[in-house]
């Protein structure tokens, strides 16, 4: 047992670390408050590479605000960001409580179909915040393949049949299935008869080590682990027994991987080391821009289709979530 001096030193070290985490969270939140658009949208950009190098162009989307409203819900300092993101999500909601990926700020947003991913994330975030959402459960569970997995797209051929046909000829396929999107559907709908095929498939993919073969749109195993963990931690704790050893052995390749890895460890009850994430924070309170997702990777394609999508604000959102979860674990230890 440590003596009194050692105990006081340990307490002092823990207090100092806690103060540094608090400061990093406040700086990150301040950056996000500045970056968040007047509409409440969290900005994201399109670039030719996963490193988001070269020319970048703004890409108005619903997705990042939905992610932020969920990820930052446990960060008291970010309450205003979450409220503004929820306001934005409510304005972007289409009939029946459905959403599409591009926001109405994008001139050709009607080209894109409604989708399961944005609908599940936005619905979960709004309901957790006590905001009203129409009963969209039936609309989501209809969008499943014969094997029970959720499709990416909520296909409505009318009132824009030519635009919809163009989208599915050049951009995507009506029967696209991505298990990260299934994870977000499970997170929203919970453990029920309609989601059990998706739960079983996620577990099978984890056991087989097939994470990157399970996603069309996302660019990192760390990202897959993060979204799977949000979906499965309360439903299938055995998933943590698979994810945690792999996560401990993996070396994050960039700030986004580092943030999602730290958050995922905390989701499964670990106390992550916050130091690498603290060290990666920049002087303006942000973390570096890294591509989170891309235009899709088909089975026979050696590389994902460009562009990639990411932003300093998006990485910072994940980092603030990670540090908040780390702080919570340290306080309860």
Model-derived regions: residue spans:
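Extracytoplasmic
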Residues: 40
């Amino acid at each position: 047992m440590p003596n009194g001096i050692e105990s006081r030193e340990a307490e002092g070290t823990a207090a100092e670390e806690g103060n540094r985490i608090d400061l990093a969270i406040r700086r990150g939140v301040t950056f996000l408050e500045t970056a968040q658009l007047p509409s409440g949208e969290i900005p994201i950009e399109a670039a030719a590479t996963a490193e988001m190098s070269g020319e970048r162009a703004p890409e108005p989307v619903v997705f990042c605000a939905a992610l932020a409203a969920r990820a930052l819900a446990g960060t008291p300092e970010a309450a205003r960001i979450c409220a503004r993101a929820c306001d934005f999500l409510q304005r972007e909601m289409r009939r029946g409580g459905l959403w599409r990926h591009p926001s109405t700020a994008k001139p050709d947003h009607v080209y894109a179909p409604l989708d399961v991913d944005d609908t599940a994330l936005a619905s979960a975030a709004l309901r957790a915040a006590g905001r009203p959402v129409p009963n969209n459960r039936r609309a989501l569970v209809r969008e499943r393949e014969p094997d029970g997995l959720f499709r990416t797209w909520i296909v409505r051929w009318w009132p824009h049949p030519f635009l919809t046909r163009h989208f599915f000829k050049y951009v995507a396929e009506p029967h696209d299935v991505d298990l990260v999107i299934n994870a977000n559907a499970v997170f929203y709908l919970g453990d029920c008869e309609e989601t059990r095929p998706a739960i079983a498939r996620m577990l099978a993919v984890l056991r087989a080590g097939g994470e990157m073969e399970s996603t069309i749109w996302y660019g990192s195993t760390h990202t897959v682990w993060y979204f799977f963990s949000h979906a499965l931690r309360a439903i299938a704790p055995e998933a943590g027994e698979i994810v945690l050893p792999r996560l401990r052995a993996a070396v994050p390749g960039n700030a986004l991987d580092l943030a999602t890895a730290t958050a995922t460890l905390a989701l499964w009850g670990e106390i992550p080391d916050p130091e690498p994430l603290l060290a990666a924070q920049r002087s303006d309170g942000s973390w570096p821009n890294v591509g989170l997702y891309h235009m899709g990777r088909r089975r026979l394609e050696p590389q994902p289709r460009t562009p990639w999508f990411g932003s300093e604000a998006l990485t910072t959102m994940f980092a603030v979530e990670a540090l908040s979860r780390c702080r919570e674990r340290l306080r309860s230890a």
